């Protein structure tokens, strides 16, 4: 495989265009969330032989943030299957384009973040939803890893942890690195492991360095769980454990 070229994520559309999606997310999720869950849960479990570990670590009520690693467009489905609580998702703004998908996102609890911009609106939505006692999913790496290795955490999850003080649940997703996209769909076994919640003392206006420090601490927990899942998978298949999850 050749060296991956850096991607340009800056969305040229004005911030005003995305206000509608933030307003919708703050009001609640619509019928599309329930429909997607009803239609996709059983097929997802069966096709990907999905299993979860540690789901009891996810608080049944109160504000919290799930912080998974991210390989596949299917990851949000994998994480949500075994959780009864509804999840609000932060997603890159470029996903809000095709009319049908945009409608589903708008009414399904998904709100955009304009990567490449100083997008305070996204963080305002995060904090408003947490004030409402909601559960959010924010990918610790800030986007999908384009290799089959864990990426590096971005400061965003650290900022949320410090500015909100809510529990952060680290989540390891193993197997979805072979489920790259809808266009290149494969059906490996996928395992989700939920770690114990971790909280941080409130800090006003934490520096970017401090945000990254906390993000790294959170993602270190993801790395440990991911490495354990790699080892378990190798033991089941009788193969030597690959050297993954480092960085």
Task: Please tell me what each predicted stretch does.
Residues 32, 59-117, 125:
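Catalytic core of membrane glycerolipid acyltransferases/transacylases, capturing the structured
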Residues 39-41, 107-113, 140-144:
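Short, basic, glycine/proline-bearing loop/turn elements
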Residues 55, 69, 92, 116, ...:
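Generic beta-structure capping elements
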Residues 1-32, 121-247:
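Non-catalytic C-terminal accessory region of glycerolipid acyltransferases
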Residues 2-54, 60, 78, 85, ...:
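A transmembrane-helix-recognition feature enriched in membrane-embedded lipid enzymes
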Residues 48, 116-119, 150:
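A conditional alpha-helix N-cap/helix-loop micro-motif detector
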Residues 56, 118, 174:
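Residue-level "edge-of-site" marker
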Residues 52, 89, 110-112, 168, ...:
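Conserved beta-strand scaffold positions in the cores of enzyme catalytic domains, especially
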């Amino acid at each position: 495989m050749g060296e991956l070229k850096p991607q340009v994520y800056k969305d040229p559309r004005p911030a005003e265009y995305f206000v509608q999606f933030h307003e919708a997310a703050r009001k609640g999720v619509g019928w599309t969330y329930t429909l997607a869950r009803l239609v996709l849960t059983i097929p997802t479990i069966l096709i990907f032989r999905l299993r979860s570990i540690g789901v009891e670590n996810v608080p049944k009520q109160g504000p919290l943030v799930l912080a998974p690693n991210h390989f596949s467009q299917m990851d949000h489905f994998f994480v949500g299957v075994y959780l009864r609580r509804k999840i609000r998702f932060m997603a890159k703004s470029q996903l809000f384009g095709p009319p049908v998908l945009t409608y589903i996102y708008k009414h399904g609890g998904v709100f955009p973040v304009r990567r490449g911009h100083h997008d305070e609106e996204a963080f305002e939505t995060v904090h408003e939803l947490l004030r409402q006692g909601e559960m959010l999913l924010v990918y610790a790496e800030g986007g999908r890893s384009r290799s089959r290795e864990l990426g590096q955490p971005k400061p965003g999850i650290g900022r949320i942890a410090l500015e909100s003080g809510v529990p952060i649940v680290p989540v390891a997703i193993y197997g979805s690195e072979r489920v790259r996209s809808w266009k290149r769909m494969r059906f490996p076994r996928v395992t989700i492991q939920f770690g114990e919640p971790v909280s941080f003392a409130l800090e006003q206006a934490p520096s970017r360095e401090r945000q990254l420090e906390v993000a790294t601490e959170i993602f270190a927990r993801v790395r440990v769980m991911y490495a354990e899942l790699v080892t378990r998978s190798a033991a089941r298949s009788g193969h030597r454990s690959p050297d993954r999850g480092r960085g």
